[in-house]
């Protein structure tokens, strides 16, 4: 499920590529006094993910932008919508917006047999744990996780994406339903790397880390109802890590064939 917000710039502003922490703060403010507030500092996926305010370029007063917020929990999105309606000023750092319109969306990859494409809306964070480095012939002396790069091959990326989505499936889907790792097929049929890049991300107040991210175009064919659920869950929660910082947000760009 998704909440689409139509935004209008309240003044001229330069686009702020370090929006992640600031936008996350507004979303957490919206979840105060809700059942989700307890997960603010929890070491687990919260469930929500979000796009950047797009298109990402400098703006003049009155220019339009769009923001998408996604989550598997309808009541979480309802809390965000209530907050956006009560306070239509949305200040993302030095980018001041007015929320003109809110719309709910329910994207769906389609019934079994449907083919389509899912594309990264924001950079995807995939890290390989140090205890798995040898299995993928990664030479490292560090105790820290290794950021995935193309030189590491597709195998660790696929494994980490599946493991991460497994965790989200356990949190947000009924326990009797099989998760992604319980199937005999991969999430996607095609993995087209668009680019890799490094950006500084403010992960908490005053703490900035540099993340190596990647953007992808994934092709899929829906195998069965379980696979449909897994792909739709990824649309709701995002792929990879740190989705609550706006990383790993994905969009359907072509489906229904």
What is the predicted role of each segment?
Residues 1-257:
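RNA-interacting cores
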């Amino acid at each position: 499920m998704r909440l689409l917000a139509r935004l209008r710039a309240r003044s001229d502003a330069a686009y702020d590529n370090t929006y992640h922490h600031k936008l996350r703060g507004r979303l957490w403010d919206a979840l105060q006094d809700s059942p989700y507030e307890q997960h603010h500092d929890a070491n687990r996926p919260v469930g929500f993910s979000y796009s950047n305010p797009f298109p990402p370029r400098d703006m003049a007063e009155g220019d339009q932008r769009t923001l998408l917020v996604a989550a598997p929990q309808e009541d979480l999105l309802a809390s965000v919508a209530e907050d956006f309606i009560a306070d239509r000023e949305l200040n993302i750092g030095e980018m001041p917006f007015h929320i003109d319109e809110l719309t709910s969306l329910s994207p769906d990859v389609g019934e079994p047999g449907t083919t389509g494409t899912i594309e990264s809306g924001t950079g995807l964070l995939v890290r390989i744990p140090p205890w798995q480095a040898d299995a993928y012939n990664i030479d490292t002396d560090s105790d820290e996780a290794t950021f995935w790069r193309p030189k590491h091959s597709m195998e660790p990326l696929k494994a980490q994406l599946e493991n991460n989505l497994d965790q989200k499936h356990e949190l947000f889907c009924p326990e009797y339903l099989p998760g992604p790792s319980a199937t005999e097929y991969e999430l996607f049929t095609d993995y087209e790397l668009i680019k890799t890049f490094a950006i500084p991300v403010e992960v908490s107040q005053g703490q900035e880390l540099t993340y190596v991210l990647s953007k992808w175009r994934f092709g899929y064919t829906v195998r069965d109802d379980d696979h449909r659920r897994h792909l739709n869950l990824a649309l709701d929660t995002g792929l990879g890590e740190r989705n609550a910082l706006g990383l790993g947000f994905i969009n359907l760009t072509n489906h229904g064939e």
